Structures are given as structure tokens and as C-alpha cells.
Amino acid sequence: MAEQVALSRTQVCGILREELYQGDAFHQADTHIFIIMGASGDLAKKKIYPTIWWLFRDGLLPEDTFIVGYARSRLTVDDIRKQSEPFFKATPEERPKLEEFFARNSYVAGQYDDAASYKHLNSHMNALHQGMQANRLFYLALPPTVYEAVTKNIQETCMSQTGWNRIIVEKPFGRDLQSSNQLSNHISSLFREDQIYRIDHYLGKEMVQNLMVLRFANRIFGPIWNRDNIACVILTFKEPFGTEGRGGYFDEFGIIRDVMQNHLLQMLCLVAMEKPATTGSDDVRDEKVKVLKCISEVETDNVVLGQYVGNPNGEGEAANGYLDDPTVPHGSTTATFAAAVLYVENERWDGVPFILRCGKALNERKAEVRLQFRDVAGDIFHQQCKRNELVIRVQPNEAVYTKMMTKKPGMFFNPEESELDLTYGNRYKNVKLPDAYERLILDVFCGSQMHFVRSDELREAWRIFTPLLHKIDREKPQPIPYVYGSRGPTEADELMKRVGFQYEGTYKWVNPHKL
């Protein structure tokens, strides 16, 4: 058998664009200007600039593309380069291309609420136009407190008159239903829905995007994907590190607003939704909204909140608790861990608990979807059989595997837990997967909104969590302490057991592949 030739990142992304957009979704001859609002910030230097570089390096951006940074700080392109280049992972062979990339960069300093600053920015962009059509893409890498002023000034002063205009908005999209609606109404008064791209980077993850294919391209899953066969669904997001000196920002939002209300709820929608009419953006998002409308507000009896404390045996950061972070307010009751149970009240899912778990300073880095199936009826193996599970692991080491029972090799007729395993690092070992931000920013250039959050999705998501969040903000319940590096509060395990999840602790996964 001939050895499989490794695909380059360019080939992978090129195939992706060809398949999704037939290669002609944007005109290569047009001028495209990518404006990073908040270019001096952490998100810009660690994610946005590196992502634009990767797309530029691999030839995936339109040929006539310019990158303009905008922020209040008095900086130069050289300053931006020094801040962001360490995250580019550029090789010595890529130096000439890197110089070409920064030659297409410029920077404009200005205030976020000053009309004169935006007129200066607009004049700068007009000078870059070379083709008949000029398209502008604004990325708001900014705190939500300045969204209203920035979007108003962009709409009044900086819109292209000869091409399309698109705006990318980063989470958090408000703090609750009221503030989210206020922000959405403001932005919707300035831009059409097809111009607004609310980014949740988890929707750009390989395995999150794979959920639709797994469900709707495999007949074997269709008949069992319902309440008759599935006992519960667990959606997990775990980080092995704490706030690491950035707790002041995190403390304003907490783990529910930061992870559960967006990342985990989006994954829930993809698990629970009905088959869309097409893979078109609005058809997919219509089905997600239908799921959200079937979910009642979270009940406090179905929620566990935790906050990590230092590990007495830990070293370095692990020895510190959340309250030891000097940026965290003294005595803060903000949760760094949350577990919540939701129910999708429709014919397919009635009575099936969807358990959402997320937290910081836990025992591992992991994001996954786990479907646990019901017990086999008519047990003939004397309670030796464990429940089947289908696991979609988003990170690390993307994988799909099924826990199942097989006969243990040998003379005796004993069942044993095993797995059917698709680990991406083994099956696709020569394929380099694009980063989530690469996929999503390429989607914006191509005008595809399938992996972005629509305003009615956002409204329903906040409706589900706002009463709980208001109660937490008002009553400030004391979160349950858990040790840095642990699995989280044992009360969360008890909640999961109460609603029907069975954790046996007997399964030992043996990785047959060396990743």
C-alpha cells in the first residue's frame, strides 16, 4: 500500500473552502479590509492576528486584503508585531511571507466614542481601496461596555459604499436577557442580521461541527437518538488551570455566563435538534431555536455551584485558591464550577436529563458530549453489563468512541467493557486540522453564518439562565469549595446520580494508538 501523503494546512483549508463555498464565494479581485477594533488587547494579539496570518500564509484570504488595527493606545505596526508575532509560530522558511503580511498591516489610534477618530479611520481605509468593490469586515475585540458607541460610529462613518460590510461581535453578549436584548436591539437598528456575526469559537471546533454529520449522515444513530434509548446526556467542559491572575475579569461574569450559557448550550442544541431541511445557515439555526424554546428556565434544585480552593499538596498555582488571586474581590462568591440539569420538553427528549458541567482548576482538560444509553431489557448476564455510551470528545485529541460490552477473551462466558474507537489523531494522522478561529473568520469572508449565533438563539439562551443568574446575583449563595486539581464538588456527582446518570468507575480505556 502506498504511503499516505500528508496534506498541508493550505490543502486542508482549500478543500474546506471548495466544499463549502464552491471556491467562488468572494471575489478575489475586490479589496477586502479586515479591521480589528481593540487591536492592542489580549484577544487580538493571541488569537485574531495569528489567525489572519495563518489564513494569509496559506493563501486563503482574497489577494487584495489589508489588515487595519484600531485602538486607543498610541502604537505602530512594529508594536503590534512585537506583541503578536510570538503567537504566530512562524518558521524560518516563512519569513519572506511574514514580511509580506506585515506590509499589508496598518494601525490607527483613536477613541471609541469620538466621531472625529472614526472619520480619520474611514479616510485611512478609503486610501487602501484599489478595486471597483471594497468590502469591510469589522472584528470587535472589545469589552461589551463600548459596543454601543463603537457600532454606532462604525455605521455612521466607516461603512463601505461600494461593497459589503460585516461585523463580528465577541461574547459576552450581555449579562442577562435584558442587557442582551438591549445590545441586540441596538446592533440590529444599525445592521441587518446578515451583516452580524456573533462568534462562539466552540462552533468552529472540529468535533462540534462533526455532530451534525455524525447524527444525520449515519442511519444507525437515527432510530436510537431519542428518549426510548438514551438515559441521559452529559456535556462537559473542564480546565486544569485557575484564573492565573485574571480573576478580576472572570469575577464579573462567573462560569455560567462564561461557558455554560454559550458553549455548552450550543453543543446541547446540536445534540437535541431535529434534522434541518438543508445545511443552509438559517435552516440549521431554525432547528436550534426550536430546541431552546422547549427548555424551561433552570431550577435551582438542579444546580450545584463550586469555587476552587488551594491544594495543600500543590505547587505553584495549584497551591492557590480562587480567593488568593489578588485581582479577585475579597470574599467573592463567584462560582468557578457549575453543574446544571436541563430538560428538552418535546416528544423526542421528554424526561431525558441534559447535564451541563463546567469548571476551572479541575483534574484534566476535557470537553466532550457523552450520551449514556438505557439498560438492556431482559438481563441474562446477571448484572455484569454496564450501560453503552457514545462519546464525542471535542478536546484534547478529538475522538468519537462507543463504550460497549463484548465477551472477555478466554474460557469463560463473561462480558467486559470495551470500545469502538475513532481517534482523529490515528485515523487522520496526516491531516492538520484548522484552528476554530480560522474556520470562523474564513466563514465571515465567505458570508456563511451557519456557525454563528442568531439573535433569537441568543434571546432564548438568556431566557433559560437569567432567572437563575439573577437569584445568584441577589442572594450570593456560598459556593461549595473543591480542591484545585480535583473532579469538582462531590455534590455535582450526587446530582448527576439523582437524575439518572450511572457512573460505574469500572471502565478502563486503553488507548491503542500512540498520539
Swiss-Prot record:
So, what pathway does this thing act in? Carbohydrate degradation; pentose phosphate pathway; D-ribulose 5-phosphate from D-glucose 6-phosphate (oxidative stage): step 1/3
Amino acids binding NADP(+) 2: 357, 366, 370, 393, 401-403, 421-423, 487, 503, 509
Share the record's PTM remark.
Answer: Acetylated by ELP3 at Lys-403; acetylation inhibits its homodimerization and enzyme activity. Deacetylated by SIRT2 at Lys-403; deacetylation stimulates its enzyme activity.
Assigned EC number: 1.1.1.49
Per its record, what are the GO molecular function terms?
glucose-6-phosphate dehydrogenase activity; identical protein binding; NADP binding
Q: What is its main location?
A: cytoplasm
Q: Which residues carry this modification: Phosphotyrosine?
A: 507
List the catalytic residues.
263
The cross-references to Pfam families, in alphabetical order and at most eight, read:
G6PD_C (PF02781), G6PD_N (PF00479)
Q: What domain of life is recorded for the organism?
A: Eukaryota
N-acetylalanine: which positions carry it?
2
Residue sites binding NADP(+) 1 per the record: 38-45, 72, 147, 171
Q: Name one GO cellular component term.
A: cytosol
Among the GO biological process terms of this entry, one is: regulation of multicellular organism growth
Q: Does the keyword Electron transport apply?
A: no
InterPro entries xrefs = G6P_DH, G6P_DH_AS, G6P_DH_C, G6P_DH_NAD-bd, NAD(P)-bd_dom_sf
Could you list this entry's UniProt keywords, alphabetically sorted.
Answer: Acetylation, Carbohydrate metabolism, Cytoplasm, Glucose metabolism, Membrane, NADP, Oxidoreductase, Phosphoprotein
Fill in the misc note. Has NADP both as cofactor (bound to the N-terminal domain) and as structural element bound to the C-terminal domain.
Q: How does it assemble?
A: Homotetramer; dimer of dimers. Interacts with SIRT2; the interaction is enhanced by H(2)O(2) treatment. Forms a ternary complex with ALDOB and TP53; this interaction is direct. ALDOB stabilizes the complex inhibiting G6PD activity and keeping oxidative pentose phosphate metabolism in check.
Q: Which family does it belong to?
A: Belongs to the glucose-6-phosphate dehydrogenase family.
Q: Which HAMAP family match?
A: G6PD (MF_00966)
Protein name per UniProt = Glucose-6-phosphate 1-dehydrogenase X
Q: Which species is this UniProt entry from?
A: Mus musculus
Give the source lineage, highest ranks first: Eukaryota, Metazoa, Chordata, Craniata, Vertebrata
Name the gene: G6pdx
